[in-house]
Amino acid sequence: LNKQGKLGALFIDYLNLINIVVSKNQLQETTDLALGSIARKTKLMAEEMEIPVILLAQLNREVDRRQGLHFPVLSDLRNSGAIEQVADVVIFVYRAEKYNIFYDPKTKEDLRGVGLLLLAKNRNGATGIAKFRYNPAMTCLTDYDPRVI
């Protein structure tokens, strides 16, 4: 990977698309173990190459069944608790509009075009939330400014 020079970062879109060959009767357990192994190997590769590896992964459907604002949590990572254990940082991208929620029930803030980056895990620092603006017509994220609607 470094033949043309040092990589700045590696993006994998996404973990659950990596083909895993297993028998039908061992599918769930083997898939979980295989995805966990891939997550661990990805982390080792990041350390060896001294680059950040951004590994995208799907969430399970529990987040859709949750009441309220449907905020994802670490246990929502699909098919692999190992992702949660291995990752240095886990960030969820969240938009209330996806769940047909257009106003914050507590603050009454207009959530149309607003998204959140939920820093759910940060091995070397604090966790928290950062807001952003989302323009679906341009598939564009920008800094959040409360004066812009």
Q: What do the PLM-derived regions correspond to, one by one?
A:
Residues 1-10, 24-26, 40-49, 62-149:
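C-terminal regions of RecA-like/P-loop NTPase motor modules
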Residues 34-39:
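…and closely analogous acidic/polar surface helices at protein-protein or active-site interfaces
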Residues 17-20, 61:
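Residues immediately C-terminal
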Residues 10-18:
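Short acidic, glycine-rich surface-loop motifs adjacent to enzyme active sites
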Residues 11-12, 51-58:
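Structural recognition of the conserved hydrophobic beta-strand(s) that form the central parallel beta-sheet
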